[in-house]
């Protein structure tokens, strides 16, 4: 039996993220992951540096870095800088980009581009010369300015091409779809809320705490294939309203308040059935059974992102649920 699943948390980089990280550290979360979507949130590296300086033991990391946002040399320097602030605590996730790209009106990068970028960043962090844009690139800091040491890199992947890159270059994989037991490190992103005993998933509190996670399902399916949302409750009406927005501006509206709030246009999508079907929403016993099943399937780390006006309540409730009795490990 392997060690129990690690319970980590994820946040959009915002004004309260240091306080959230301090609370997460105090109640036993393994790591704080921050998103890298500059059209929506604050700069991921600035906020990670602040967390590094205001916490002592909790792991930290960006999830996920997207190659087009920073030159490989700039990215490697940022990684090394934060690693120096929190030695041994930093891990990095890199992927093709979904929200970060979509909010700029772009599609995700190809896996060929992303593979090259990961290899470049890894080489630069090891002090190697790498070819970037046809020229030799290398970190050449004065002595003592940047550390040269390996930093764990997980690859954010869901399909076969990404999983192949994760096997080749990653220390693990990060996913939003299911478990991958072939990896020693498999991190799964989760959203939702632990309901109080007897609480309805249609309560006002549940809608505030898990609603942003449900509406993201519609956003993602729309970006993959607009017709997909027509099969979801309220999907055709939501799509019709969204598509009244001029196409050159639509990407800005689609992801409004992503994983933070539910904008007016999305509120009709909320339902108790939607929350329990598409998010980690339910009473503690239900979620604990799901957590154990997920661990048994091969997930080694859960990244729980709390939403709503009472993030502290969500963090505590999820950790209480996860900590009640021994957690199942993977075989």
What does each of the following model-derived ranges do?
Residues 1-331:
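Active-site-adjacent structural elements that line small-molecule/cofactor binding pockets in enzymes
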